[in-house]
Amino acid sequence: VREPKLLWNLPGNIVPPVTPFDANGKVDVAALRREVDYVVAAARPAAICVAGVEAQEYQYLDEAGRRDLIAATIDAIGGRVPALVGISHASYRESIALAEYAAKLGASAVQLLIPNRPSGGPATTAELVKYFGMISSASPLPMVAYHNPGPGAEVGLPALREILALDNIVGLKESSRNQRFLGTLIADVEDQGLAHVFTTMEVLFPTLILGCAGGTMPAPGAAISALLVEAVRAGDLARAAQMHALHAEMPARWVGANGLVPVMKASLRALGLDCGEPYPPFGAVSAAHVA
């Protein structure tokens, strides 16, 4: 048993701001700063995820643009909450370079996607452990592994345990929403002190009850998630259940027909934060779904 090294206010939520783009496809830094201010004030996050999940659309940027986005977001955070910086890349060398860059900017930790083989198909457990070992051993910051089947690999609990047993890997962001799997994962990883486990919106309430460290929440749902976490910490499970009922509907009611990023940007606009449209050619929420 080891003690995880994320010195954050847990249980709590990690919030990844969406990336606002202007009409020319450039990052709208002013809009980004307004969104970060909203996240800090309304979501009271344990950390802000910086260019670390696919819904942040960082993958459309070139390497210089990605680094500029990281720097602009950390500057907008201004030390108010910890920054968790994404370093996912097919090249382990580039991931290490991004980790070093994040450390120079004052980040708290880095996040790395569990990948498929860049050439196609699933990687073996041995390959994934080697990939994470090469990066985590060279990273100046502690690392959160990111399990997101689809954009990344789908791996089972034995492989996750091997990855999380590596030195300097202190957390797991888990996106499967499979509650049966999550129950065993929390028991074998969080409860055993191997690493902190962060789930996601639809399963936040039940997994908090099981003892997870929190969740990764999209910006427009993060204020509700903060209320849910605070209710659980206070022992007010009836209040937490009310917040959970809201999560059960949003974004599930709209995301299937429109996609996650369009729903998140439309939701932020409804909150008074215009973060633009998804990066082209992928479209916005259909007019029929905009109230």
Q: What are these regions, as identified by a protein language model?
A:
Residues A31, G65, E127, R177, ...:
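Soluble or luminal CAZymes and related metallo-dependent hydrolases
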